Amino acid sequence: MDEPLFSCVLPCAKGSEQVLQQEAEQLGVQTLSIAPAVVRGKASLLTFYRLCLWSRTASRVLLVLAHENVDSAEAIYEVARNIAWEDHIAPDDTFAVRFNGLGCGIRNTQFGALKIKDAVVDRLRDIVKRRPDVDAKTPDILLDAHLHKNELTLALDLSGGSLHERGYRQAHGAAPMKETLAATLLYRARWHEFCAQPATLIDPTCGAGTLVLEAAMMAADYAPNLQRQHWGFTRWQNHRPALWNKVIDEAQTRKNAGIAALSDYVFYGYDQNPVVIAAARANAKRLGLEDFVHFAPKRLEDLTADFGARGFVVANPPYGERLGEVQELIPTYAALGHWFKTLPADWEMAVIASNDALLKRMRLRAHKYYQAFNGTIAAQIVHYRRSEQPESQETAAQQKLAQASVGISEQAQMFANRLQKNIQKIRPSAERAQTDAYRIYDQDMPEYAVAIDCYGDAVVIQEYAPPKTIDPQKAQQRLFDVLQVVPEVLALDERSVFLKTRQRQTGKTQYNPAAEKRNEERIVYEGAARFLVNLSDYLDTGLFLDHRPMRRLLFEQAAGKRVLNLFCYTATASVQAALGGASYTTSVDLSPTYLDWAQRNFDLNALSDRHRLQRADVMAWLHSGKSQFDMIFCDPPTFSNTKKEQRVFDVQRDQIALIDGCMQRLAAGGILYFSNNYRGFRLEEALCARYCVQEISENTIDFDFKRRPKIHRVWKIMHRSDGEQSAEK
């Protein structure tokens, strides 16, 4: 006699519907329809068991008990009460209701679940004179209710919870990939067909190993849910243990045979984080696959092509949605594409990513694209074949941009041309200035609102935050144009390009380091000086390029003088004064981070101990002593917080107190160089009356800042008697 068929609903991730339909039909489901995130059909109890054990892509397996039109909360109650719950739930069982949807008087899902719970309890109390208890966390029976428009579907959740919880992954990384999505990726890329013959599989960004382990299970004919300990049918009144055990035994037999054949396969998972590698190894051990799957800490950039003639690459690299800024991931995607092109012709690759611009950075020709969702994140699964990659593409990508066929826009080509012209003009000036740290571009084209600074063999791109009126997608595309063009025009490795977003700073954020320090340090030169710069961890690099002329002026005038540097930052001005022969220098700043950096700059230039670093609030320090100086350089921030003194410094408001304090420390015949970069700054007339003041800003703008002459302003200030005597001479 034929087994009776029941209506089934198989929820899944959006984008997985067709894969799940094919899988369900192979397991015995008679498919009726597919819709976004769900497959519906008919199935026998045996097929339901097989779905629970063998479906790699379904989120849940639901057996429908009722599907009715409703128009009110009371109608929902009546539909639920008319179900013969006594045939499904024993009086001693616990149950819970999961409700999705709104409408028909249901304003929140808790109320919808309560109406169904009341109907179940009322029915059982009337029929069997007892009511079951509710257990929201680990119920024996889990009911699933879905309300869409006026249609209510009420079902038993035979899976007892999401089927991505296979039971083997108890440790994972920061952004784990669901096992069901991993299986979808593998099906989309036809891994289940590829692995019909022995092969090698590699995940170069494996995290806790989900993709590798799902691929190994697929190759071994290993039922994905064989490790699960909890099901939603074990206490169900219609459960048939003998039939279920038969399904389990069959799966165990297939698994044993499949694992025996795995010795002809090789599975590798790599990640630069040793913590997640340890988690991946533990997950493999729970599956009994530790002898066949090899996890090791390794950077993507360090991978070789020595993995055999035939194989498959799978990757779920960071998307840039939550794990980091998109621009920081460009080297990762570029390295992935470059490495894949070093593999033999019979290799294939499947990548899931959410950002099309990042995928383009791999410079690969896609075989097929598939839409997918990783949780709420819209993504793409892209299938590549090594044999379909033009052999000439890599060479073209490395040629000059003007000859390269890299698919950039006409506007991006104009930006590249401008950059080329700037470099040809600026580099000779930099050589004459004896420096390898200089600016080559600063918003020359309004569409590309960035500044580009060279630091030896590296580049820092500073993106000016676009106004809210600019379409964010257009702004991002222009940024990608910049990030694509710069390394090619300058012939740099993309890992030597650093991006920072410059926006209006607040007192609390202007000096904040990056969330995760990378410590990308370089040594640059400026005349006789050597400076340490950090290109990755702070908004500024430790060297203000626009003040190069001021540092040169201090070097030229410092011989035999006592020099004071206020708000000294990393004390690069003090270093130049010391190299220029200053009798001694004193550098004052409140930041221990920058004073440590300053000490490293002094050490780098082999300067003696007579050059003093002082941690102090500048305003308080000026009024706490009487020592005199022949030359003072004061370059305050526009504003800053001073926790210890419980005040906020504002350069416009506090300029008189600051300059008066400096002049009290300035010896007769001395010079104060006062500078700031606040564009709205106005020097108080009282200061001009009190001292001899001369603005010298025009003389402090060097070759690489001629396009932006208002980047800072500088005044030469002397005691009036000294200034008048100087003028007479």
UniProtKB/Swiss-Prot annotation:
Compartment(s) where it occurs, according to its Swiss-Prot or TrEMBL record: Cytoplasm
A single MF term (Gene Ontology): RNA binding
Catalytic activity entry: guanosine(2445) in 23S rRNA + S-adenosyl-L-methionine = N(2)-methylguanosine(2445) in 23S rRNA + S-adenosyl-L-homocysteine + H(+); guanosine(2069) in 23S rRNA + S-adenosyl-L-methionine = N(2)-methylguanosine(2069) in 23S rRNA + S-adenosyl-L-homocysteine + H(+)
Keyword Heme: no
Domain of life: Bacteria
Domain THUMP: 47-158
rRNA processing in keyword set: yes
Enzyme class at the top of the EC tree: transferase
Pfam families (alphabetical): Methyltrans_SAM, RlmL_1st, THUMP, UPF0020
Alphabetical UniProt keywords: Cytoplasm, Methyltransferase, RNA-binding, rRNA processing, S-adenosyl-L-methionine, Transferase
EC number: 2.1.1.173, 2.1.1.264
InterPro entries membership: 23SrRNA_methyltr_KL, DNA_methylase_N6_adenine_CS, RlmKL-like_Mtase, RlmL_1st, SAM-dep_methyl-trfase, SAM-dependent_MTases_sf, THUMP_dom
One cellular-component annotation, GO: cytoplasm
PANTHER family: RIBOSOMAL RNA LARGE SUBUNIT METHYLTRANSFERASE K/L (PTHR47313), RIBOSOMAL RNA LARGE SUBUNIT METHYLTRANSFERASE K_L (PTHR47313:SF1)
Similarity comment: Belongs to the methyltransferase superfamily. RlmKL family.
UniProt function note: Specifically methylates the guanine in position 2445 (m2G2445) and the guanine in position 2069 (m7G2069) of 23S rRNA.
UniProt name for this protein: Ribosomal RNA large subunit methyltransferase K/L
Origin species: Dichelobacter nodosus (strain VCS1703A)
